[in-house]
Amino acid sequence: LIGYKLESGFRRGDGLHLTLYWQALGQLDQDYVVFNHLTGEDGVTYAQKDNPPVDGYYPTSRWAVGQVVRDRYDLFIPADAPAQAYVIETGLYLPATGQRLNILDCAAASCAGGDRVALYRFEIGGG
């Protein structure tokens, strides 16, 4: 993951329009699935989108080394989301086993447990 763009009003009922920018540092011999989670500080996942990259049209095994791949996702903040802090996290996993790909450069990324990246944190207030 070399970058992302996020568009939203960050209010209950709003969409989270997320564009991820991936770049393969080496040839990938397996096809991974991308996961995107909206998780509250209570540990509950309130929105989730797991999908092969580019809606399945461009599997990771076909990525060329150095090529930048643009990958869009839409999640929605539930209308009844409780007032608390939230984090949007992303990562990759093997669909057959569920094993997540480890993050290699945690200094450059906001790693959350070594197998996902915390992209953005925000609060939803009361009322």
Where does each model-flagged region fall?
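C-terminal luminal/periplasmic domains and tails of membrane-associated envelope-modifying transferases
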Residues: 1-127
